[in-house]
Amino acid sequence: MEAIIRTERIEKIYYQGRPEEVRALNQIDLEIPKNRLVLIRGPSGSGKTTLLNLISTIDRPTHGRIFLRGEDISRYSDVQLSRIRQKTIGLIFQSYNLLPRLPAWENVAFPLLPLGVMERERRGRSVEMLIQLRLEKRVDHPPEQMSGGEQQRVAIARALINDPEIVIADEPTSNIDAESIQILLDIFMDLKSKGKTIIVSSHDPVFLDCSETIFFLKDGRLVNIEQRESR
């Protein structure tokens, strides 16, 4: 299987102003296959979110290298990494990271601003995405007037607005209702059918049945890899 992301002995160390270091990740070697739904599991504090931050280029490893489509991006500048996030990676944060008073469509359109997309097109693309997520009645409503499940769907729409090749989601089903969870699963399956790669960090058992590659972390180490047949 072709790897879209590969890590080579990556480590993340935090010093936190104390003499002893905190090693959040330790010597992680993994390959994330293209066009797969990948699940990252492990107990709280095992390094799941830290790993997502590194492979999404939000943060940099203390040691080791990260490859995207075979190219070492470890020494890319911040500007280069920002361009990768804009064009290649869609991020779904556990905390949603929405602007609470802006209309839903403007939140969704936010990633289009640096690309110079005109307002009419931004709104059109955002509304289309919100309709796909069954939020057609919430287009002009701000997130502060929405339920947790609706806010998560707005965050998903924002992550997908640039048609990213890779979608990365951190605990995407936490604090949302059953309907929103099913919508999310349907979206992920649809994305995969279009050749996208989906990487999810979650404790939720709903992802176990649909995931094809499962990485298990413990105490900052990769302790198990499970490969399944493509679905």
Locations of regions flagged by a protein language model:
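Catalytic Walker B motif of ABC-type/P-loop ATPase nucleotide-binding domains
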Residues: 167-170
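Conserved ABC ATPase signature
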Residues: 142-146, 150-152
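Conserved signature/switch motifs of ABC ATPase nucleotide-binding domains
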Residues: 86, 141-144, 162, 194
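Short coil-to-helix segment of the ABC ATPase nucleotide-binding domain corresponding to the Q-loop/switch region
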Residues: 102-110
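Conserved ABC transporter NBD signature motif
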Residues: 64-72
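Helix N-cap at the start of a conserved alpha-helix in ABC-type nucleotide-binding domains
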Residues: 178-180
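Helix-to-loop junction immediately C-terminal to a conserved catalytic motif
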Residues: 56
